[in-house]
Amino acid sequence: MSEQANYSGTDASGVGLIGRADDSVLPIGMHDFTEAAHRCVLVDKTMFIADVLDCDASIVVCCRPEGFGKSMNLSMLRAFLERPAVGRADRSLFAGTQIWDAGGGRYRGEYACYPVVSLDFSGAVGSGAAVAGVVRDALSSECVRLLPFLEAPDLPRDKVRHIERVARGAANEDEVDSVLAVLIELLEMACDEQVVLLVDGYDAAWLSRAGIRGTRDDGPTELLDRVLFDAIVAAGDSMRLACLMGECPGPAE
């Protein structure tokens, strides 16, 4: 990604910094942008958000080696775009950053605007037969986290119950594997806004190089096709964008 051709910050060096307190530390081993911005000094990479928002494609696949800030960038993207379930977003997190001032502030209109589905499949790497469990646990966790958005009485009750069963761990494999498309549909209806999908380690199951044997006798690529990519296709205009982070192109090609 270009980071808007290395947008020039306020420093003479052209490098913008976030969190310049004298006692700030480097975010070594940290992946949560909000926590890091409050506790550490960060190089301002917020124009990555502009790169994603300005991309002509609605699906952005970012491939970077391990240790190159994939999880931090996704966390930053989520912190900027995610609409809170209750209350108002705190604008101070991005005040003074490059993205906040770029283009005369034109990106501020998308701040805290969208419901965000955030999936982390990175734990599936090397997990062998447990790949399916890692993927399905990630889906279940997001159903739990996003349930507060689905309290509107006019939502289709059968679909809300589908989400609730997955959140409680009472759903069968078919229901879990198909839940992402339902979740995106309901979030768009509940919030009257398109949905953002963020996936960390989308290629993890493929990278594991280990076939899995479940009730469907599927391999990891087929699992991702069914759980992730079929849902992206089904979502259509319900999604503002999808950003997938991984180490290799693999199944996203």
Where are these regions (language model features)?
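Structural recognition of the conserved hydrophobic beta-strand(s) that form the central parallel beta-sheet
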Residues: 196-200, 226-227, 240-247
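Phosphate-binding P-loop
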Residues: 49-57
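Conserved P-loop NTPase "ATPase switch" module shared by AAA+ and STAND
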Residues: 124, 191-217
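Substrate-engagement module of ASCE P-loop NTPases
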Residues: 143, 179-190, 217-240
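Walker A/P-loop nucleotide-binding motif
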Residues: 58-76
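Charged, amphipathic alpha-helical linker segments immediately N-terminal to NTP-binding catalytic cores
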Residues: 2-36
